[in-house]
């Protein structure tokens, strides 16, 4: 049976694969996403490019250690009126982000990369425009 190496420590991404009966093994890439994002922002990269590059970087880095397996890397960013919002580090940050998004249209960009032997096999991204409901 095919096993996917998940270049992530995300419990949500692992659960999605598990729910679809996809054998997987999480192996986080341990890249410093903030450093990569800041570098790409300085180069005026779009949110789509930032998400795609992070997904590729994660998958390619981990795949060097698992030459016989497919490695899945993924990344999501939120664009709120030109400001990139990263995933929260804790519950308080999550609440602050939700307050910031409250009642405002924002963009969710998610990218997925499949890599083998340190080289990209496939990459795709999805761009969704989402309204955030006004809190009562």
Regions found by a protein language model. Give the residues of each.
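Residue-level signal for inorganic ion chemistry
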Residues: 17, 55, 75, 94, ...
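Active-site-adjacent loop/tail segments of enzyme domains
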Residues: 76-106
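Conserved small/polar residues in nucleotide/adenosyl-binding loops
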Residues: 126-132
């Amino acid at each position: 049976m095919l096993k996917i190496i998940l270049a992530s420590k995300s419990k949500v991404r692992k659960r999605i694969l598990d729910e679809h009966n996809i054998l997987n093994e999480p192996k986080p890439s341990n890249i410093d996403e903030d450093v990569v994002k800041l570098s790409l922002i300085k180069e005026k990269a779009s949110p789509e490019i930032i998400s795609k590059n992070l997904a590729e970087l994660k998958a390619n880095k981990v795949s060097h250690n698992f030459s016989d397996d497919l490695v899945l890397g993924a990344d999501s960013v939120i664009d709120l009126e030109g400001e990139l919002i990263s995933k929260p580090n804790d519950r308080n940050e999550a609440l602050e982000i939700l307050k910031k998004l409250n009642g405002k249209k924002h963009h969710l960009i998610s990218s997925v990369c499949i890599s083998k032997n340190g080289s990209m096999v496939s990459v795709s991204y999805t761009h969704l425009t989402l309204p955030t409901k006004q809190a009562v």
